[in-house]
From Swiss-Prot:
Record SUPFAM superfamilies: GroES-like
GO biological process: chaperone cofactor-dependent protein refolding
One GO cellular component term noted in the UniProt record for this chain: cytoplasm
Protein name: Co-chaperonin GroES
Gene name of the record: groES
InterPro entries associated with the record: Chaperonin_GroES, Chaperonin_GroES_sf, Chaprnonin_Cpn10_CS, GroES-like_sf
HAMAP family named among the record's database cross-references: CH10
Length: 102
């Protein structure tokens, strides 16, 4: 678990995953500083905390396909956005992850 995740004291349930979106650059190519309202939601995020996993109908626990620290690709509008200590995070289901970036 990352240091940041340890201080959050949050544990997603089931097949949910806590991620933090990558920060959008605050400066445009021409050197213009972009206000928060002009920034786009990022579709890349770092996996911070994994839930307990998904269980099949027979009770088998399925392993996650991602690990803490992975950088993932997700839909910009996936999951539930939450704020903890003035930081933005997203809780999403493992099925909402499209890819792991290597």
């Amino acid at each position: 678990m990352s240091d940041q995740a340890t201080t959050l004291r949050i544990k997603p349930l089931g097949d949910r995953i806590l991620v933090k979106r990558e920060e959008e650059e605050a400066t445009a190519r021409g050197g213009i500083i972009l206000p928060d309202t002009a920034k786009k939601k990022q579709d890349r995020a770092e996996v911070l905390v994994l839930g307990t996993g998904k269980r099949t109908d027979d009770g088998t626990l399925l392993p996650f396909e991602v690990q803490v620290g992975d950088i993932i690709l997700m839909d910009k509008y996936a999951g539930q956005e939450i704020t903890i200590d003035d930081e933005e995070y997203v809780i999403l289901q493992s099925s909402e992850i499209m890819a792991v970036l290597k």
